[in-house]
């Protein structure tokens, strides 16, 4: 993000005075998909694309907001019980309300912000906004005494209460806690986490956005969650002396023991979840050893599981995965909930240009539009820039 670009817009729209500048990143999730609601592990990292905001207290009880990208301006009172209608401004309003609930005496301020997180690419621009605004509020009104976890939770609460999205905690966590050159294994049950090195010399990490999103009949995500719950119920009945809260508590032998007691569909979905738990742990070990070939192998295994067992892929994503294999890409998989969106790819430097040319040309020839290409670097989390 260009600091001078944001600053020039802030000065133009707010009486010529400057404020403080803050940045919060989007995120990728290298591996660990559909594991959060099963009490498992996710493995995100912050990236070098995000949201930048300039903020300055204005001595009133009014928050004056300007979206540089949308060229839209909104104002609201700090104590307004309803808040603004514009969705983008409700992210700011929600964070103000959540900080007030934490006991922070938030006053009026001016804010202008812009982002370079590609929309629809699964890098969580919304969490980057919440984290950026939270970082600013913490610095300006709380003397940086609000914990990182509380900032992340305030972002999650903003989505739940003011945007109407029932998200998990991974996106906000990654944006707030990210570190340059580090991925984070987050235990979605205990919220304990650990940093792991990600410095793939000789490789690039790149997202390929299919730009398709399939709207399916029914509630495919809820259906898969219900499948997992069905298997947990069967496990509890079969093993009455053991407590099963989620599939996190099951091992392979226990899953096989209830195979005949659940539907084939529920079994294969649970099979994916147990396999994904093992793959996350294997990738952590591989990163410590600097073994990026194993990391890539596990990414391909996850894609296969998401496509054939969990059944959240689509023709376009499977095609991107196939083209990656044909071009010698070290690892490739669906990133995100599925049914469209991106693949995340680990590509050797000397194959990168050829892969990008081939995947762009082949996908365009087959589907009539070019995919979007986003190389990313694992970067620092939310911080004050200047």
Task: Give the location of each predicted region.
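C-terminal nucleotide
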Residues: 1-27, 52-85, 182-331, 346-386
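Gly/Ser-rich oxyanion-binding loop with an adjacent helix/lid
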Residues: 1-22, 28-32, 37, 41, ...
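Short Gly/aromatic-enriched secondary-structure transition segments
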Residues: 39-46, 224-225
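Short, charge-rich binding segments
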Residues: 44-46, 54-57, 103
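FabD-like malonyl-/acyl-CoA
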Residues: 128, 342-346
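Glycine-rich phosphate-binding loop
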Residues: 339
């Amino acid at each position: 993000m260009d600091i001078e670009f944001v600053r020039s817009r802030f000065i133009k729209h707010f009486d010529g005075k400057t404020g403080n500048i803050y940045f919060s990143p989007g995120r990728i999730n290298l591996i660990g998909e559909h594991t959060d609601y099963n009490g498992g592990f996710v493995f995100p990292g912050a990236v070098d694309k995000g949201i930048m905001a300039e903020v300055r207290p204005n001595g009133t009880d009014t928050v004056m907001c300007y979206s540089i990208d949308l060229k839209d301006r909104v104002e609201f009172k700090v104590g307004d019980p309803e808040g603004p209608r514009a969705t983008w401004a409700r992210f700011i309003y929600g964070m103000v309300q959540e900080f007030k609930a934490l006991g922070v005496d938030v006053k009026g301020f001016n804010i202008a912000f812009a982002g370079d997180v590609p929309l629809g690419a699964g890098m969580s621009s919304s969490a980057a906004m919440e984290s950026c605004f939270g970082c600013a509020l913490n610095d300006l009104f709380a003397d940086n005494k609000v914990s990182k976890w509380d900032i992340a939770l305030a972002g999650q609460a903003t989505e739940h209460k003011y945007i109407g999205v029932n998200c998990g905690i991974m996106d906000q966590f990654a944006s707030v806690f990210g570190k340059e050159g580090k991925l984070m294994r987050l235990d979605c049950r205990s919220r304990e986490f650990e940093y792991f090195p990600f410095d793939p010399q000789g490789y690039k990490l790149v997202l390929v956005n299919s730009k398709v999103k399939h709207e399916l009949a029914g509630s495919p995500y809820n259906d898969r969650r219900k499948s997992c719950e069905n298997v947990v119920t069967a496990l509890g009945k079969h093993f009455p002396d053991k407590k099963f809260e989620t599939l996190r508590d099951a091992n392979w032998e226990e899953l096989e023991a209830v195979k005949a007691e659940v539907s084939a569909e529920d079994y294969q979905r649970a099979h994916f979840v147990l396999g994904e738990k093992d793959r996350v742990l294997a990738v952590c070990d591989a990163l410590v050893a600097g073994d990026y070939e194993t990391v890539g192998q596990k990414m391909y295994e996850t894609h296969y599981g998401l496509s054939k067992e969990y059944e959240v892929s689509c023709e376009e994503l499977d095609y991107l995965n196939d083209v990656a294999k044909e071009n010698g890409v070290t690892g490739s998989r669906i990133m995100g909930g599925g049914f469209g969106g991106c693949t995340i790819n680990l590509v050797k430097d000397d194959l990168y240009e050829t892969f990008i040319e081939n995947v762009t040309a082949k996908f365009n020839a087959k589907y009539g539009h070019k995919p979007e290409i986003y190389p990313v670097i694992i970067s620092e989390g939310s911080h004050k820039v200047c």
